[in-house]
C-alpha cells in the first residue's frame, strides 16, 4: 500500500528472508568487520538501502509490548555494519524514520526502540486493531476502510 503512494519506494519484507542474529560464531567482526560470517545475508543490503534513502518506513507488529524479534535482530546486527565507520552511522541516523505499528498495547517501548535509529524523533502511527473493530491475531486490519484511510493520511502527510 505504501509503495503505491510513494513512487520509487522499495519494500523489504522480513518474512521473505532471514537475517542471522549475532552468535554461533567467534565474533570475528569485532576484529575485522569483513569477517562476519553472516555478511552475505540481507542485513547489509537493508542498511545500505536505508543509508541511501530519503525516508524509511518500518511496519512493525507488537508482540508482548515490544517490536518483533526480527526488528531486534536487525538492530543487533547493525553494530557490525557501523563498526569503524561512523560516517555510515551518521548517514543512517540522519535519514528520517517513520513507523506503522500494529499494537493494542504499550506505545512507549516502540518509541524507545525507534529512538536509536534516528537523530530526529521517529514519527509513529499506532494502529490498535480493537480501535477498528478487529482482532489483531486475525491479521485483517487492512479490511477496515478507516485503518487504510489512517495509513494513507500518515503516508501522505509532510
What spans do the regions from the language model cover?
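N-terminal beta1-alpha1-beta2 submodule of the flavodoxin-like/Rossmannoid cofactor-binding fold
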Residues: 1-60, 65-80, 142, 146-158
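A short, structured active-site edge motif that brings together acidic residues
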Residues: 14-18, 92, 128-131
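Short, charged/polar "capping" segments at the starts of alpha-helices
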Residues: 19, 106-111, 134-137
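Active-site nucleophile elbow and catalytic-triad environment of alpha/beta-hydrolase enzymes
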Residues: 40, 85-87
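Extended interfacial segments that mediate partner engagement and assembly in macromolecular machines
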Residues: 61-64, 83-85, 92-93
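Short, intrinsically disordered/low-complexity patches at protein termini
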Residues: 76, 81-82, 89-92, 133-134
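Short, glycine-/small-residue-rich phosphate/pyrophosphate-handling segment
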Residues: 87-128
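Glycine-rich phosphate/pyrophosphate-binding loop and the adjoining helix
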Residues: 114-158
